[in-house]
């Protein structure tokens, strides 16, 4: 699989990444929110041992041994969740070298296994998750009920325990406010759309996460195919909206795109929300072939690297808010200059 952030493949039109997440629990332990720190760390050791023969592939990060800032950088890279950080005294995660796989331990469930790849490639992500899940299940007993399927802390994950999602760029549907209808429609068919950091996260930069909401009574194939059908419809709506807006407001759109690029290339201070909004207009310009000398790879990298914790890690310094804005503007200018 290809890491969506750093891939040089330029085929990720509208859909930036695809993710498959499996929720699993061990049969001989209670759920993470009820276990002690000692029990939680025992679970971490138990899962580590299963993958010890795969040491060349995976690295273990124990949150209680990590600097708080480093924890947040992995959140900003979509490798862990805010819930795992809250469980930092007994939480850990395992990832591979190219960071396309992340196995969270003691988040809401004992295991939250996720595989992320670039573009609209849900089947590829599922194959990756399935292979690692099979390896773990060969060595550990999962909590499983013949009628309900995989047992999970939250009832919405019962059954396959599978959550399929895509990160999708919908600037035009946001501009014409059609996105509100999509929000409403998805809820009615058991899907959800939210910010890119999942439940409770704010939508910024016109980037959304679309995923299934229920798993009970559905096979893995049905969950994936249902989501694919919905995402194809959203993609078509976004493309039609782009065609329409270019016919009616061509110069206004071009002005927004080039104005955004101009600000990014010259700003002295940039806050993260403004930066993501401007990057969205530039991405739209690239996707619509208005801008030809900026790569999607650079835009993807900037989407992550301009985040508050990432900026501080890149410059290896604890920064004030104004200092972060200054370094963010500096980083953006440098990356765009080298983008051609």
UniProtKB/Swiss-Prot annotation:
Task: Provide a GO biological process annotation.
Answer: phosphocreatine biosynthetic process
Does the UniProt entry include the keyword Transmembrane?
no
Q: At which positions is ATP bound?
A: 17-21, 112, 163-167, 194-199
Coiled-coil residues are none
Query: EC number(s) on record?
Result: 2.7.14.1
- Its job: Catalyzes the specific phosphorylation of arginine residues in proteins.
What is the source species? Clostridium tetani (strain Massachusetts / E88)
Is the Transcription regulation keyword given for this protein? Answer: no
Q: Which NCBIfam families match?
A: PRK01059.1-4 (NF002194)
Protein name in UniProt: Protein-arginine kinase
Q: Which family does it belong to?
A: Belongs to the ATP:guanido phosphotransferase family.
